[in-house]
Swiss-Prot record:
GO biological process: one example: 5-amino-1-ribofuranosylimidazole-4-carboxamide transmembrane transport
Gene behind this protein: THI72
Name assigned to this protein: Thiamine transporter THI72
Record's GO cellular component terms: cell periphery; fungal-type vacuole; plasma membrane
Biased composition (Basic and acidic residues): 579-590
Keywords associated with the record: Membrane, Phosphoprotein, Transmembrane, Transmembrane helix, Transport
Membrane topology according to the record: Multi-pass membrane protein
Role of this protein: Low affinity thiamine transporter responsible for intake of thiamine. It is possible that the primary function is the uptake of closely related compounds and that thiamine transport is a secondary activity of these proteins.
Modified residues (Phosphoserine): S560, S572
Protein localization: Membrane
Amino acid sequence: MSFGTRISRALRFLEIPVKNRASVNFLRNPDLQPIKSVNQTWGFWSNFAYWGVLSFNVGMWIGGSSALTVGLSYSETIGAFIIADLLTILFALANSCPGYDWKVGFTLAQRFVFGIYGSALGIIIRILMSIVYYGSNAWLGGLCVNMILDSWSHHYLHLPNTLSSKVAMTTKELIGFIIFHILTAFCYFMKPYHMNYILIWSCVGTFFAMLGMVIYLTKSAHGVGDLFTSTHSTVTGSKKAWAWVYTISYWYGSVSPGCTNQSDFSRFGSSNCAIWTGTIVALLIPATLIPVFGIIGASACEKLYGQTFWMPMDIFDNWLTTNYSAGARAATFFCGFCFVMSQISYTISNCGFASGMDLAGLLPKYVDIKRGAIFAACVSWACLPWNFYNSSSTFLTVMSSFGVVMTPIITVMICDNFLIRKRQYSVTNAFVLKGEYYFTKGVNWRAIVAWVCGMAPGLPGIAWEVNNDYFHNTGIINFFYGDSFFSFLISFFVYWGLCLLFPFKITVKHDDKDYYGAFTDEEARKKGMVPYSEISEEEIRAYTLGECFTSGHEYKPESSDDELPELTKTSSENTKVFEIVHQKDNEKESSTSSEKQIA
Protein backbone atom coordinates (compact mmCIF):
# COMPACT_ATOMS: atom_id res chain seq x y z
CA MET A 1 0.00 0.00 0.00
CA SER A 2 1.46 3.37 -1.03
CA PHE A 3 2.00 6.23 1.40
CA GLY A 4 -0.56 8.36 -0.41
CA THR A 5 -3.18 5.64 -0.10
CA ARG A 6 -2.53 5.34 3.62
CA ILE A 7 -2.90 9.09 4.09
CA SER A 8 -6.12 9.06 2.08
CA ARG A 9 -7.55 6.25 4.19
CA ALA A 10 -6.49 7.97 7.40
CA LEU A 11 -8.17 11.21 6.38
CA ARG A 12 -11.30 9.33 5.38
CA PHE A 13 -11.31 7.61 8.76
CA LEU A 14 -11.11 11.01 10.48
CA GLU A 15 -14.14 12.38 8.63
CA ILE A 16 -17.15 13.02 10.82
CA PRO A 17 -19.67 10.14 10.80
CA VAL A 18 -22.64 10.96 8.58
CA LYS A 19 -25.21 8.87 6.72
CA ASN A 20 -24.43 10.53 3.41
CA ARG A 21 -20.78 11.40 2.81
CA ALA A 22 -21.77 13.75 0.01
CA SER A 23 -23.31 16.03 2.66
CA VAL A 24 -19.83 16.81 3.98
CA ASN A 25 -17.06 18.73 2.24
CA PHE A 26 -14.66 21.58 2.98
CA LEU A 27 -17.53 24.09 3.16
CA ARG A 28 -20.34 22.27 4.89
CA ASN A 29 -21.51 19.64 7.31
CA PRO A 30 -24.92 19.08 8.95
CA ASP A 31 -23.96 21.20 12.00
CA LEU A 32 -23.56 24.27 9.79
CA GLN A 33 -27.00 24.11 8.22
CA PRO A 34 -29.81 26.36 9.47
CA ILE A 35 -31.69 25.15 12.54
CA LYS A 36 -35.00 23.50 11.73
CA SER A 37 -38.08 25.33 12.99
CA VAL A 38 -39.03 22.47 15.35
CA ASN A 39 -35.77 23.01 17.25
CA GLN A 40 -36.23 26.76 17.67
CA THR A 41 -37.61 26.45 21.19
CA TRP A 42 -35.75 29.08 23.20
CA GLY A 43 -38.27 31.45 24.74
CA PHE A 44 -37.75 34.28 27.23
CA TRP A 45 -36.32 32.17 30.04
CA SER A 46 -33.92 30.29 27.78
CA ASN A 47 -32.54 33.49 26.28
CA PHE A 48 -32.42 35.05 29.73
CA ALA A 49 -30.51 32.04 31.04
CA TYR A 50 -28.02 32.09 28.15
CA TRP A 51 -26.89 35.58 29.14
CA GLY A 52 -27.78 35.00 32.78
CA VAL A 53 -25.06 32.38 33.27
CA LEU A 54 -22.61 35.12 32.37
CA SER A 55 -23.67 36.85 35.60
CA PHE A 56 -24.65 33.96 37.85
CA ASN A 57 -21.14 32.58 38.18
CA VAL A 58 -18.02 33.05 40.24
CA GLY A 59 -16.27 35.14 37.58
CA MET A 60 -18.92 37.86 37.76
CA TRP A 61 -18.84 37.83 41.59
CA ILE A 62 -15.13 38.73 41.57
CA GLY A 63 -15.47 41.15 38.64
CA GLY A 64 -15.63 44.17 40.91
CA SER A 65 -12.20 43.43 42.37
CA SER A 66 -10.52 43.73 38.98
CA ALA A 67 -12.32 46.92 38.00
CA LEU A 68 -11.52 48.64 41.29
CA THR A 69 -7.82 48.69 40.41
CA VAL A 70 -8.37 51.70 38.12
CA GLY A 71 -9.14 54.01 41.05
CA LEU A 72 -12.92 54.48 41.01
CA SER A 73 -15.09 54.18 44.09
CA TYR A 74 -17.53 51.31 44.50
CA SER A 75 -20.53 53.39 43.47
CA GLU A 76 -18.71 54.82 40.44
CA THR A 77 -17.60 51.34 39.41
CA ILE A 78 -21.19 50.10 39.56
CA GLY A 79 -22.31 53.09 37.47
CA ALA A 80 -19.69 52.28 34.84
CA PHE A 81 -20.86 48.66 34.83
CA ILE A 82 -24.43 49.75 34.09
CA ILE A 83 -23.31 51.87 31.13
CA ALA A 84 -21.20 48.98 29.85
CA ASP A 85 -24.18 46.64 30.19
CA LEU A 86 -26.27 48.98 28.04
CA LEU A 87 -23.50 49.04 25.43
CA THR A 88 -23.31 45.25 25.50
CA ILE A 89 -27.07 45.00 25.02
CA LEU A 90 -26.89 47.14 21.88
CA PHE A 91 -24.08 45.07 20.38
CA ALA A 92 -25.67 41.75 21.32
CA LEU A 93 -29.10 42.57 19.89
CA ALA A 94 -27.70 44.10 16.70
CA ASN A 95 -25.50 41.08 16.11
CA SER A 96 -28.27 38.58 16.82
CA CYS A 97 -30.12 39.43 13.60
CA PRO A 98 -28.37 37.00 11.19
CA GLY A 99 -29.09 34.16 13.60
CA TYR A 100 -32.73 35.00 14.07
CA ASP A 101 -33.40 36.18 10.50
CA TRP A 102 -31.83 33.20 8.73
CA LYS A 103 -31.27 30.64 11.55
CA VAL A 104 -27.54 30.42 10.87
CA GLY A 105 -24.57 30.48 13.21
CA PHE A 106 -21.43 32.57 13.46
CA THR A 107 -19.58 30.64 10.74
CA LEU A 108 -22.07 31.42 7.98
CA ALA A 109 -22.48 34.98 9.28
CA GLN A 110 -18.71 35.39 8.82
CA ARG A 111 -18.91 34.02 5.27
CA PHE A 112 -21.68 36.50 4.49
CA VAL A 113 -19.43 39.42 5.46
CA PHE A 114 -15.76 38.41 5.17
CA GLY A 115 -16.06 35.96 2.29
CA ILE A 116 -15.72 32.20 1.92
CA TYR A 117 -11.99 32.22 2.73
CA GLY A 118 -11.86 35.50 4.64
CA SER A 119 -14.28 34.11 7.22
CA ALA A 120 -11.43 32.00 8.61
CA LEU A 121 -9.96 35.13 10.21
CA GLY A 122 -12.86 35.82 12.55
CA ILE A 123 -13.45 32.13 13.19
CA ILE A 124 -9.85 31.48 14.26
CA ILE A 125 -9.82 34.53 16.53
CA ARG A 126 -13.09 33.44 18.11
CA ILE A 127 -11.72 29.92 18.66
CA LEU A 128 -8.66 31.30 20.45
CA MET A 129 -10.87 33.49 22.64
CA SER A 130 -13.10 30.54 23.48
CA ILE A 131 -10.13 28.41 24.48
CA VAL A 132 -8.77 31.11 26.80
CA TYR A 133 -12.19 31.59 28.38
CA TYR A 134 -12.60 27.83 28.62
CA GLY A 135 -9.43 27.54 30.67
CA SER A 136 -10.39 30.45 32.89
CA ASN A 137 -13.88 29.13 33.63
CA ALA A 138 -12.70 25.56 34.07
CA TRP A 139 -10.18 26.72 36.66
CA LEU A 140 -12.90 28.50 38.64
CA GLY A 141 -15.12 25.46 38.17
CA GLY A 142 -12.42 23.26 39.65
CA LEU A 143 -12.31 25.46 42.75
CA CYS A 144 -16.07 25.04 43.06
CA VAL A 145 -15.70 21.26 42.79
CA ASN A 146 -13.30 21.44 45.72
CA MET A 147 -16.00 23.14 47.77
CA ILE A 148 -18.12 19.99 47.47
CA LEU A 149 -15.19 17.69 48.23
CA ASP A 150 -14.17 19.83 51.22
CA SER A 151 -17.66 19.49 52.67
CA TRP A 152 -17.44 15.71 52.36
CA SER A 153 -14.03 15.14 53.91
CA HIS A 154 -12.06 16.96 56.59
CA HIS A 155 -8.95 15.16 55.34
CA TYR A 156 -9.46 16.52 51.82
CA LEU A 157 -9.92 20.02 53.25
CA HIS A 158 -6.38 19.83 54.60
CA LEU A 159 -4.91 17.78 51.75
CA PRO A 160 -1.17 18.53 51.58
CA ASN A 161 0.28 20.02 48.41
CA THR A 162 2.64 17.68 46.58
CA LEU A 163 3.32 19.93 43.58
CA SER A 164 6.40 22.05 43.10
CA SER A 165 6.38 25.54 44.58
CA LYS A 166 7.12 26.84 41.08
CA VAL A 167 3.64 25.75 39.96
CA ALA A 168 0.96 28.32 40.76
CA MET A 169 -1.54 25.73 41.96
CA THR A 170 -1.92 23.05 44.60
CA THR A 171 -2.70 19.36 44.43
CA LYS A 172 -6.29 20.03 45.50
CA GLU A 173 -6.75 22.60 42.77
CA LEU A 174 -5.40 20.22 40.15
CA ILE A 175 -7.80 17.49 41.28
CA GLY A 176 -10.77 19.86 41.10
CA PHE A 177 -9.66 21.11 37.69
CA ILE A 178 -9.52 17.58 36.27
CA ILE A 179 -12.88 16.57 37.76
CA PHE A 180 -14.54 19.68 36.35
CA HIS A 181 -13.21 18.92 32.86
CA ILE A 182 -14.60 15.39 33.06
CA LEU A 183 -18.04 16.57 34.21
CA THR A 184 -18.18 19.17 31.47
CA ALA A 185 -17.19 16.74 28.72
CA PHE A 186 -20.37 14.69 29.22
CA CYS A 187 -22.48 17.71 28.25
CA TYR A 188 -21.11 17.72 24.71
CA PHE A 189 -23.02 14.57 23.82
CA MET A 190 -26.27 16.55 23.66
CA LYS A 191 -27.37 19.01 21.00
CA PRO A 192 -26.67 22.69 21.79
CA TYR A 193 -30.33 23.66 21.59
CA HIS A 194 -31.15 21.14 24.36
CA MET A 195 -28.93 22.78 26.98
CA ASN A 196 -31.40 25.56 27.80
CA TYR A 197 -32.88 23.69 30.77
CA ILE A 198 -29.43 23.28 32.32
CA LEU A 199 -28.86 27.00 31.88
CA ILE A 200 -32.17 27.95 33.46
CA TRP A 201 -31.86 25.79 36.57
CA SER A 202 -28.23 26.73 37.14
CA CYS A 203 -29.21 30.41 37.08
CA VAL A 204 -31.99 29.83 39.59
CA GLY A 205 -29.83 27.79 41.97
CA THR A 206 -26.83 30.12 41.79
CA PHE A 207 -28.93 33.22 42.38
CA PHE A 208 -30.36 31.87 45.61
CA ALA A 209 -26.95 30.57 46.70
CA MET A 210 -25.39 34.01 46.21
CA LEU A 211 -28.34 35.78 47.78
CA GLY A 212 -28.09 33.51 50.82
CA MET A 213 -24.38 34.29 51.15
CA VAL A 214 -24.97 38.04 51.08
CA ILE A 215 -27.82 37.83 53.59
CA TYR A 216 -25.77 35.72 56.00
CA LEU A 217 -22.65 37.91 55.74
CA THR A 218 -24.48 41.22 56.13
CA LYS A 219 -26.55 39.89 59.02
CA SER A 220 -23.44 38.59 60.78
CA ALA A 221 -21.57 41.86 60.15
CA HIS A 222 -24.62 43.97 61.12
CA GLY A 223 -24.44 45.79 57.80
CA VAL A 224 -22.48 45.91 54.58
CA GLY A 225 -19.25 46.93 56.28
CA ASP A 226 -17.21 50.10 56.19
CA LEU A 227 -15.24 49.15 53.09
CA PHE A 228 -18.31 49.39 50.87
CA THR A 229 -19.28 52.88 52.06
CA SER A 230 -15.88 54.42 52.84
CA THR A 231 -13.95 53.63 49.64
CA HIS A 232 -13.49 56.77 47.56
CA SER A 233 -12.10 57.49 44.14
CA THR A 234 -8.32 57.91 43.99
CA VAL A 235 -8.33 59.77 40.67
CA THR A 236 -9.60 63.22 39.74
CA GLY A 237 -10.14 65.42 36.71
CA SER A 238 -9.42 63.99 33.28
CA LYS A 239 -7.85 60.89 34.81
CA LYS A 240 -11.14 60.13 36.49
CA ALA A 241 -13.03 60.59 33.21
CA TRP A 242 -10.68 58.19 31.44
CA ALA A 243 -10.97 55.76 34.35
CA TRP A 244 -14.73 55.71 33.72
CA VAL A 245 -14.13 55.11 30.02
CA TYR A 246 -11.66 52.33 30.77
CA THR A 247 -13.97 50.57 33.23
CA ILE A 248 -16.77 50.65 30.67
CA SER A 249 -14.46 49.23 28.00
CA TYR A 250 -13.13 46.58 30.37
CA TRP A 251 -16.59 45.42 31.38
CA TYR A 252 -17.77 45.31 27.78
CA GLY A 253 -14.54 43.63 26.66
CA SER A 254 -15.06 40.80 29.12
CA VAL A 255 -18.24 39.72 27.30
CA SER A 256 -17.51 40.86 23.73
CA PRO A 257 -16.69 37.32 22.52
CA GLY A 258 -20.26 36.36 23.45
CA CYS A 259 -21.60 39.27 21.42
CA THR A 260 -19.52 38.23 18.43
CA ASN A 261 -21.09 34.81 17.99
CA GLN A 262 -24.53 35.82 19.22
CA SER A 263 -26.06 34.34 16.06
CA ASP A 264 -24.93 30.87 17.21
CA PHE A 265 -27.63 31.00 19.88
CA SER A 266 -30.14 33.58 18.62
CA ARG A 267 -30.99 31.04 15.89
CA PHE A 268 -32.53 28.87 18.63
CA GLY A 269 -34.98 31.65 19.55
CA SER A 270 -38.69 30.98 19.22
CA SER A 271 -39.46 34.65 18.60
CA ASN A 272 -37.70 37.96 18.21
CA CYS A 273 -39.49 39.26 21.30
CA ALA A 274 -38.14 36.39 23.41
CA ILE A 275 -34.59 37.10 22.25
CA TRP A 276 -34.80 40.83 22.89
CA THR A 277 -36.52 40.73 26.27
CA GLY A 278 -34.44 37.82 27.55
CA THR A 279 -31.18 39.48 26.51
CA ILE A 280 -32.07 42.93 27.86
CA VAL A 281 -33.24 41.70 31.26
CA ALA A 282 -30.29 39.31 31.70
CA LEU A 283 -27.62 41.83 30.74
CA LEU A 284 -29.12 44.72 32.67
CA ILE A 285 -30.18 43.27 36.03
CA PRO A 286 -28.00 40.25 36.98
CA ALA A 287 -24.90 41.71 35.31
CA THR A 288 -25.21 44.72 37.63
CA LEU A 289 -26.50 42.93 40.72
CA ILE A 290 -23.93 40.12 41.06
CA PRO A 291 -20.83 42.39 41.10
CA VAL A 292 -22.58 44.38 43.81
CA PHE A 293 -23.06 41.13 45.73
CA GLY A 294 -19.34 40.49 45.39
CA ILE A 295 -18.40 43.95 46.66
CA ILE A 296 -20.83 43.71 49.60
CA GLY A 297 -19.53 40.25 50.43
CA ALA A 298 -15.89 41.43 50.44
CA SER A 299 -16.79 44.45 52.56
CA ALA A 300 -18.70 42.38 55.11
CA CYS A 301 -15.88 39.82 55.24
CA GLU A 302 -13.37 42.53 56.07
CA LYS A 303 -15.48 43.56 59.04
CA LEU A 304 -16.07 39.96 60.16
CA TYR A 305 -12.73 38.30 59.48
CA GLY A 306 -10.30 41.15 58.89
CA GLN A 307 -9.79 40.09 55.26
CA THR A 308 -11.50 41.05 52.00
CA PHE A 309 -12.39 37.66 50.55
CA TRP A 310 -13.24 38.25 46.89
CA MET A 311 -13.45 34.60 45.90
CA PRO A 312 -16.63 32.91 47.22
CA MET A 313 -14.59 29.73 47.60
CA ASP A 314 -12.26 31.51 50.04
CA ILE A 315 -15.23 32.47 52.20
CA PHE A 316 -16.40 28.87 52.49
CA ASP A 317 -12.86 27.66 53.03
CA ASN A 318 -12.58 30.07 55.95
CA TRP A 319 -15.85 28.79 57.41
CA LEU A 320 -14.80 25.16 57.18
CA THR A 321 -11.31 25.80 58.48
CA THR A 322 -12.50 27.67 61.57
CA ASN A 323 -15.59 25.56 62.27
CA TYR A 324 -16.09 22.24 60.48
CA SER A 325 -19.68 21.96 61.66
CA ALA A 326 -22.67 20.28 60.05
CA GLY A 327 -24.18 23.66 59.17
CA ALA A 328 -21.00 24.94 57.53
CA ARG A 329 -20.57 21.70 55.60
CA ALA A 330 -24.20 21.75 54.38
CA ALA A 331 -23.95 25.38 53.25
CA THR A 332 -20.67 24.68 51.49
CA PHE A 333 -22.05 21.62 49.71
CA PHE A 334 -25.26 23.22 48.41
CA CYS A 335 -23.56 26.46 47.35
CA GLY A 336 -20.69 24.49 45.83
CA PHE A 337 -23.13 22.35 43.85
CA CYS A 338 -24.89 25.46 42.50
CA PHE A 339 -21.58 27.11 41.63
CA VAL A 340 -20.37 23.98 39.82
CA MET A 341 -23.59 23.90 37.78
CA SER A 342 -23.26 27.57 36.89
CA GLN A 343 -19.63 27.13 35.83
CA ILE A 344 -20.54 24.09 33.74
CA SER A 345 -23.40 26.00 32.11
CA TYR A 346 -21.26 29.02 31.34
CA THR A 347 -18.37 26.92 30.08
CA ILE A 348 -20.39 24.72 27.73
CA SER A 349 -22.52 27.55 26.31
CA ASN A 350 -20.00 30.36 25.88
CA CYS A 351 -16.83 28.33 25.41
CA GLY A 352 -17.36 24.63 24.64
CA PHE A 353 -20.26 24.63 22.20
CA ALA A 354 -19.16 28.01 20.84
CA SER A 355 -15.68 26.75 19.98
CA GLY A 356 -17.19 23.52 18.65
CA MET A 357 -19.37 25.47 16.24
CA ASP A 358 -16.41 27.59 15.16
CA LEU A 359 -14.12 24.60 14.60
CA ALA A 360 -16.90 22.87 12.66
CA GLY A 361 -16.96 25.90 10.38
CA LEU A 362 -13.20 25.89 9.98
CA LEU A 363 -12.82 22.15 9.25
CA PRO A 364 -16.37 20.95 8.51
CA LYS A 365 -15.22 17.73 6.89
CA TYR A 366 -13.42 16.49 9.99
CA VAL A 367 -14.91 18.39 12.94
CA ASP A 368 -18.44 18.55 14.26
CA ILE A 369 -19.62 20.48 17.31
CA LYS A 370 -18.90 17.63 19.74
CA ARG A 371 -15.37 17.04 18.46
CA GLY A 372 -14.61 20.74 18.43
CA ALA A 373 -15.82 21.29 21.98
CA ILE A 374 -13.76 18.40 23.35
CA PHE A 375 -10.71 19.66 21.44
CA ALA A 376 -11.11 23.12 22.99
CA ALA A 377 -11.37 21.55 26.44
CA CYS A 378 -8.10 19.69 25.95
CA VAL A 379 -6.21 22.66 24.51
CA SER A 380 -7.44 25.01 27.27
CA TRP A 381 -4.86 23.44 29.58
CA ALA A 382 -2.14 25.12 27.52
CA CYS A 383 -3.43 28.54 28.63
CA LEU A 384 -2.23 27.87 32.20
CA PRO A 385 -5.45 29.41 33.56
CA TRP A 386 -4.26 29.16 37.16
CA ASN A 387 -1.94 32.07 36.37
CA PHE A 388 -4.91 34.29 35.42
CA TYR A 389 -5.86 34.67 39.07
CA ASN A 390 -2.47 35.39 40.61
CA SER A 391 -3.36 39.08 40.56
CA SER A 392 -6.47 40.97 39.54
CA SER A 393 -4.49 43.31 37.27
CA THR A 394 -3.20 40.41 35.16
CA PHE A 395 -6.67 39.02 34.74
CA LEU A 396 -8.00 42.50 33.95
CA THR A 397 -5.50 42.79 31.10
CA VAL A 398 -6.49 39.42 29.64
CA MET A 399 -10.20 40.19 29.85
CA SER A 400 -10.16 43.77 28.60
CA SER A 401 -7.83 43.15 25.67
CA PHE A 402 -10.34 40.80 24.01
CA GLY A 403 -12.51 43.76 23.08
CA VAL A 404 -9.69 45.34 21.07
CA VAL A 405 -9.76 42.43 18.63
CA MET A 406 -13.43 41.47 18.73
CA THR A 407 -15.18 44.85 18.58
CA PRO A 408 -14.10 45.63 14.97
CA ILE A 409 -15.39 42.22 13.85
CA ILE A 410 -18.75 42.88 15.50
CA THR A 411 -18.85 46.36 13.98
CA VAL A 412 -18.22 45.20 10.42
CA MET A 413 -20.91 42.52 10.78
CA ILE A 414 -23.43 45.08 12.05
CA CYS A 415 -22.63 47.58 9.30
CA ASP A 416 -22.87 44.94 6.56
CA ASN A 417 -26.13 43.56 7.92
CA PHE A 418 -28.01 46.82 8.34
CA LEU A 419 -26.52 49.23 5.80
CA ILE A 420 -25.10 47.07 3.01
CA ARG A 421 -27.18 43.90 2.76
CA LYS A 422 -30.31 45.28 4.45
CA ARG A 423 -30.63 42.05 6.50
CA GLN A 424 -30.87 39.97 3.31
CA TYR A 425 -28.58 36.93 2.94
CA SER A 426 -28.62 33.77 0.83
CA VAL A 427 -27.88 30.74 3.00
CA THR A 428 -27.32 28.35 0.11
CA ASN A 429 -24.67 30.66 -1.34
CA ALA A 430 -22.67 30.34 1.87
CA PHE A 431 -22.01 26.70 0.89
CA VAL A 432 -20.73 27.59 -2.58
CA LEU A 433 -17.09 28.41 -3.20
CA LYS A 434 -17.50 30.86 -6.08
CA GLY A 435 -20.93 32.14 -5.24
CA GLU A 436 -22.38 35.36 -3.89
CA TYR A 437 -19.81 35.58 -1.10
CA TYR A 438 -16.66 34.84 -3.09
CA PHE A 439 -15.80 38.56 -3.42
CA THR A 440 -12.09 38.82 -4.40
CA LYS A 441 -10.55 35.35 -4.44
CA GLY A 442 -12.76 34.35 -1.55
CA VAL A 443 -12.02 37.38 0.62
CA ASN A 444 -13.98 40.59 1.19
CA TRP A 445 -10.94 42.85 1.49
CA ARG A 446 -13.12 45.78 2.55
CA ALA A 447 -14.06 43.97 5.75
CA ILE A 448 -10.43 42.97 6.41
CA VAL A 449 -9.21 46.55 5.99
CA ALA A 450 -11.94 47.89 8.28
CA TRP A 451 -11.06 45.29 10.93
CA VAL A 452 -7.35 46.16 10.81
CA CYS A 453 -8.06 49.90 10.96
CA GLY A 454 -10.25 49.44 14.02
CA MET A 455 -7.94 47.01 15.81
CA ALA A 456 -4.42 48.33 15.15
CA PRO A 457 -4.61 51.57 17.19
CA GLY A 458 -5.50 49.60 20.32
CA LEU A 459 -2.63 47.10 20.15
CA PRO A 460 0.05 49.41 21.63
CA GLY A 461 -2.28 50.00 24.57
CA ILE A 462 -2.36 46.28 25.32
CA ALA A 463 1.45 46.22 25.38
CA TRP A 464 1.49 49.22 27.71
CA GLU A 465 -1.06 47.61 30.01
CA VAL A 466 1.16 44.56 30.37
CA ASN A 467 4.22 46.71 31.10
CA ASN A 468 3.73 50.41 31.87
CA ASP A 469 7.42 51.10 31.23
CA TYR A 470 7.15 50.48 27.47
CA PHE A 471 6.16 54.09 26.78
CA HIS A 472 4.23 56.98 28.31
CA ASN A 473 2.23 58.36 25.39
CA THR A 474 -1.00 59.67 26.90
CA GLY A 475 -2.86 59.64 23.59
CA ILE A 476 -2.20 55.95 22.94
CA ILE A 477 -3.09 55.05 26.50
CA ASN A 478 -6.36 56.99 26.42
CA PHE A 479 -7.27 55.46 23.06
CA PHE A 480 -6.81 52.04 24.62
CA TYR A 481 -9.01 53.07 27.53
CA GLY A 482 -11.83 54.01 25.16
CA ASP A 483 -11.13 51.39 22.51
CA SER A 484 -14.66 49.97 22.59
CA PHE A 485 -16.01 53.33 21.43
CA PHE A 486 -13.23 54.43 19.09
CA SER A 487 -12.70 51.12 17.31
CA PHE A 488 -16.43 50.84 16.66
CA LEU A 489 -16.56 54.24 14.96
CA ILE A 490 -13.40 53.61 12.94
CA SER A 491 -14.38 50.16 11.68
CA PHE A 492 -17.97 51.16 10.97
CA PHE A 493 -17.21 54.18 8.82
CA VAL A 494 -14.17 52.63 7.12
CA TYR A 495 -16.19 49.62 6.00
CA TRP A 496 -19.17 51.74 4.97
CA GLY A 497 -16.90 54.11 3.07
CA LEU A 498 -15.05 51.33 1.26
CA CYS A 499 -18.36 49.76 0.21
CA LEU A 500 -19.43 53.11 -1.22
CA LEU A 501 -16.15 53.70 -3.03
CA PHE A 502 -15.61 50.12 -4.17
CA PRO A 503 -19.08 48.56 -4.27
CA PHE A 504 -19.73 44.90 -4.96
CA LYS A 505 -22.81 43.74 -6.80
CA ILE A 506 -25.57 42.01 -4.90
CA THR A 507 -27.11 39.50 -7.30
CA VAL A 508 -28.81 37.16 -4.82
CA LYS A 509 -30.64 38.81 -1.95
CA HIS A 510 -32.00 35.67 -0.33
CA ASP A 511 -32.95 32.11 -1.15
CA ASP A 512 -36.15 31.64 -3.10
CA LYS A 513 -37.06 28.49 -1.16
CA ASP A 514 -36.78 27.31 2.44
CA TYR A 515 -34.66 24.26 1.63
CA TYR A 516 -33.72 23.54 5.24
CA GLY A 517 -37.09 23.75 6.99
CA ALA A 518 -35.88 26.69 9.08
CA PHE A 519 -39.19 28.57 8.94
CA THR A 520 -42.86 27.89 9.35
CA ASP A 521 -44.96 28.25 6.21
CA GLU A 522 -46.14 31.68 7.32
CA GLU A 523 -42.63 32.91 8.10
CA ALA A 524 -41.29 31.64 4.78
CA ARG A 525 -43.99 33.41 2.79
CA LYS A 526 -43.34 36.67 4.64
CA LYS A 527 -39.71 36.42 3.57
CA GLY A 528 -40.73 35.78 -0.04
CA MET A 529 -39.68 32.12 0.06
CA VAL A 530 -41.45 28.95 -0.98
CA PRO A 531 -42.30 27.09 2.27
CA TYR A 532 -40.51 23.88 3.11
CA SER A 533 -43.79 21.93 2.94
CA GLU A 534 -44.26 22.91 -0.72
CA ILE A 535 -40.82 21.79 -1.94
CA SER A 536 -40.40 18.36 -3.48
CA GLU A 537 -38.62 15.67 -1.48
CA GLU A 538 -36.02 15.29 -4.21
CA GLU A 539 -35.10 18.96 -4.07
CA ILE A 540 -34.98 18.97 -0.27
CA ARG A 541 -32.77 15.90 -0.31
CA ALA A 542 -30.47 17.54 -2.83
CA TYR A 543 -29.89 20.55 -0.60
CA THR A 544 -29.95 19.07 2.89
CA LEU A 545 -28.08 15.82 2.19
CA GLY A 546 -25.67 17.28 -0.30
CA GLU A 547 -26.69 15.25 -3.34
CA CYS A 548 -26.55 18.44 -5.36
CA PHE A 549 -22.79 18.39 -4.77
CA THR A 550 -22.66 15.74 -7.42
CA SER A 551 -24.43 17.88 -9.98
CA GLY A 552 -21.04 18.43 -11.60
CA HIS A 553 -21.39 22.15 -12.15
CA GLU A 554 -19.89 25.15 -10.50
CA TYR A 555 -22.06 28.21 -9.97
CA LYS A 556 -20.74 31.33 -11.63
CA PRO A 557 -21.97 34.45 -9.82
CA GLU A 558 -22.11 37.96 -11.15
CA SER A 559 -21.27 39.36 -7.71
CA SER A 560 -17.60 38.32 -7.58
CA ASP A 561 -14.89 40.95 -7.88
CA ASP A 562 -12.86 38.46 -9.95
CA GLU A 563 -13.44 37.20 -13.46
CA LEU A 564 -14.36 33.59 -12.87
CA PRO A 565 -13.81 30.69 -15.28
CA GLU A 566 -16.62 29.18 -17.26
CA LEU A 567 -18.73 26.41 -15.78
CA THR A 568 -16.67 23.25 -15.63
CA LYS A 569 -17.04 19.66 -14.58
CA THR A 570 -15.22 18.68 -11.41
CA SER A 571 -13.60 15.31 -10.83
CA SER A 572 -13.58 14.68 -7.07
CA GLU A 573 -16.87 14.19 -5.28
CA ASN A 574 -15.51 15.78 -2.10
CA THR A 575 -14.43 18.95 -3.89
CA LYS A 576 -17.54 19.46 -5.98
CA VAL A 577 -19.40 22.65 -5.29
CA PHE A 578 -23.14 22.26 -5.35
CA GLU A 579 -25.35 24.20 -7.68
CA ILE A 580 -27.29 27.02 -6.03
CA VAL A 581 -30.50 26.48 -7.91
CA HIS A 582 -31.70 24.25 -10.69
CA GLN A 583 -30.69 25.13 -14.25
CA LYS A 584 -34.03 26.71 -15.04
CA ASP A 585 -33.79 28.84 -11.91
CA ASN A 586 -30.30 29.94 -12.97
CA GLU A 587 -31.59 30.95 -16.39
CA LYS A 588 -34.46 32.86 -14.82
CA GLU A 589 -32.20 34.56 -12.32
CA SER A 590 -29.62 35.59 -14.93
CA SER A 591 -32.31 37.30 -16.97
CA THR A 592 -33.84 39.16 -14.04
CA SER A 593 -30.80 39.62 -11.80
CA SER A 594 -30.44 43.14 -10.51
CA GLU A 595 -27.32 45.10 -11.43
CA LYS A 596 -27.90 47.32 -8.44
CA GLN A 597 -24.67 48.28 -6.65
CA ILE A 598 -24.25 49.21 -3.02
CA ALA A 599 -24.76 52.87 -2.36
